[in-house]
Amino acid sequence: MAKILIGTSGFSYNEWKDRFYPIHLPQSDFLSFYCQEFNAVELNFSYYRMPTLSQCRQMVEKSGHRVEFVIKAFKGLTHEITDQSIPEILPQFKESITPFSQRNTLCAVLVQFPQSFRYTPSSRVYLQSLIKGLSPMPVCVEFRQREWLKDSVYATLKELNAGFVCVDEPSLRDLLPPVAVATSDIGYIRFHGRNRSKWYAGDSKERYDYLYSEDELTAWLPKIYTLAEQTEKVFVFFNNHKNAQAITNARMMTNLLNK
């Protein structure tokens, strides 16, 4: 049975003060505090801006090697793809996150494509080039477009030893259903919430404004155990970060798995 690690998508939210972090805790100490409770964290700041070596070194040091890191790929590799994405941006991104791999704390790079990334010949070629370019770093791929749910895609990911990211998100046209698929030795699940009304209409905070019930999380347990039987490690991350709901649900899932 694989090791199951639970955490949140991002940790540096000021609105979590007095909900998770002590009210007077400086933001520079958030990661150290987070690591006292959780054993994995998904870093998402790297999507919005290219990480720096010093940032990554500081995070490794502040973690005290108590958590396993997943770092989200920079948007220039997934959402704002150009002719320079592979030859220029990719090497820069790989170099910037070397402190994690040097300290053996980097478990995967999360490559999350937008809904506009369609299942086309050019997209398939790009996907393979990106995964190969990130090697030897482990890669896990999240699609937001249902077109990619194909056995041929799973086979390609297996061939490239890249993980498939399972998701829980609103039941809307073109989004992915809650399937449990393993294509590498890493199982991966992201809980985005089920806020149908705000998924397209709201901003990023409103989109992920959702608190899972215990019954909704319990329904995932068989899928988590299935992934654990097929992999060496399973990550479960909560992205419903508004008002620290991700913390509430991460704790809830931890308790359910420990029963």
Task: Label each residue range with its predicted role.
Residues M1-K259:
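Residues lining hydrophobic/aromatic ligand-binding pockets adjacent to catalytic sites
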